[in-house]
Amino acid sequence: MRELIRLVSSAGTGHFYTTDKNKRTTPDKIEIKKYDPVVRKHVVYKEAKIK
């Protein structure tokens, strides 16, 4: 049961990545440090629903 999710930048730039995750193995929200090209730094990306 893989579900599409959106990883939104915590820097407030509006940049996001889309990915999928297995809801059964990881039921809690994901927080990953990824590169934000708008601010040119690695920042924390938090999971959000795809609208």
Curated annotation (Swiss-Prot):
Pfam entry (one): Ribosomal_L33
CC terms in the record's Gene Ontology section: cytosolic large ribosomal subunit
Gene Ontology MF, one: structural constituent of ribosome
UniProt keyword list: Ribonucleoprotein, Ribosomal protein
Cross-referenced Gene3D superfamilies: Ribosomal protein L33 (2.20.28.120)
InterPro entries: Ribosomal_bL33, Ribosomal_bL33_CS, Ribosomal_bL33_sf, Ribosomal_zn-bd
SUPFAM superfamilies reported for this sequence: Zn-binding ribosomal proteins
GO biological process: translation
Family: Belongs to the bacterial ribosomal protein bL33 family.
PANTHER family associated with the record: 54S RIBOSOMAL PROTEIN L39, MITOCHONDRIAL, LARGE RIBOSOMAL SUBUNIT PROTEIN BL33M
Alphabetized NCBIfam families for the sequence: PRK00595.1, rpmG_bact
HAMAP family reported for this sequence: Ribosomal_bL33
Protein name according to UniProt: Large ribosomal subunit protein bL33
Lineage, uppermost ranks: Bacteria, Pseudomonadati, Pseudomonadota, Gammaproteobacteria, Pseudomonadales
